[in-house]
Amino acid sequence: MQRVTSYLPAGTPSSHPTAQVKLPHDLRHLRRKLLHLENGEMVMLDLKDPVLFANGDLLVREDGELIEILAADEKLFEIRGRDRTHLVELAWHLGNRHLAAQIEEDRIVILRDHVIRNMLQGLGATVLEINEPFQPARGAYHSHGGHSHDHGHAAHDHGHAAHDHGHNHDHDHGHAHGHDHQHDHNCDHDHDHGHHHGHKHD
């Protein structure tokens, strides 16, 4: 099986990929992973450090052949505002919830989340269901480990470090149980904080 230990950015001159691999956004943050190519072959990606790949980036096989990374279609919401100012306000609300977002001149694209859709519609946004590649802004996405739906895959691709970040975002949607609320869950701590092992009868 061929190994991949290096890569090239999208648009590298004189690059001619001979194979492709389609990946959703939450599987494009990689370090070591077995990849199934579109032609049925498999390669082992084995990089020194985790890399957040974008559509069109190239993996370099040991034999010199190039593999193009393609962003797979995903179930998304397309968000449009009344005007540019309104769209900026909507982007602020999404950013305040640490959601991965693809921000364009006249629209914002996010993963489908019906709670968020209701919020956006309440703010006057037009929200449509679409299926297309998702390429969230790299800044916040890279530093925070992505949207709530990321932790299931990203953690396995680049070690336990993902857990230092991923679990602080998903829980903004009404089921938080992060460190800020640790004393609300007595069973997770010393029993002196709550029910004294159930022996208190008075």
From Swiss-Prot:
Region (Disordered) residue ranges read 138-202
Q: Which terms in the Gene Ontology molecular function aspect does this entry carry?
A: nickel cation binding; unfolded protein binding
Per the entry, what this protein does is: Involved in urease metallocenter assembly. Binds nickel. Probably functions as a nickel donor during metallocenter assembly.
Give the lineage.
Bacteria, Pseudomonadati, Pseudomonadota, Alphaproteobacteria, Hyphomicrobiales
Q: What is this protein called?
A: Urease accessory protein UreE
The entry sums up its family as follows: Belongs to the UreE family.
* Cellular component annotations (GO), alphabetically ordered: cytoplasm
At the top level, the lineage of the source is Bacteria
